[in-house]
Amino acid sequence: AACVLGIMSIIREFHPQVEVHGIIAACENMPGCSAYKPGDILTAKNGKTIEVDNTDAEGRLTLADALCYACELGVDEVIDLATLTGACVVALGTNAAGIMGNDDTLVKNLIATADRNGEKYWELPLWDEYFDSLKSDIADMKNTGSRWGGASTAGVFLQKFVKDVKWAHIDIAGVAFLEKPQQEFIKGATGAGVRTLLNYILEQ
């Protein structure tokens, strides 16, 4: 959300040649008597049902509806980013964000743009087999799978809410906040994604 706010707060100063929508799926995340529980069945904006297997995997649920909404806007490309999975941090550490998507050209262009702007993106797979661990007996899918390949299973989950549009997902869990200085970044929030996405938009 902070990345999207950062981009949208300054992008008009650069007069981009393409139409840009910034979407933030903001909601309150708080325990209480009305909080969702394991075993609940949720219905997403596109009508797909989701069995809540793990309440800690809440970010992908809000992203799912945001992706559905974005695809309804008649856009050419959808790029989402989130501090989505600890599994991405395990895989790539704090040196690179994970990226995956349904269009090779879009993914490769984003990786190249990141490289030119001091960020590192590493492509992770979106193989159909990853969805096997998300299958549910009582809904279209579960919100989490096995502990293995967690970044990719989260990506495959999100892909189910993308329709008829080029899409890329960037998992910035490992690079959004640093516990100690690293390369040109100081300790703390890094603004991960802002430089890459802003420059990608301006290059269109």
Which residues does each PLM region occupy?
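A generic structural signal for tightly packed, nonpolar segments enriched in small/aliphatic residues
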Residues: A1-Q204
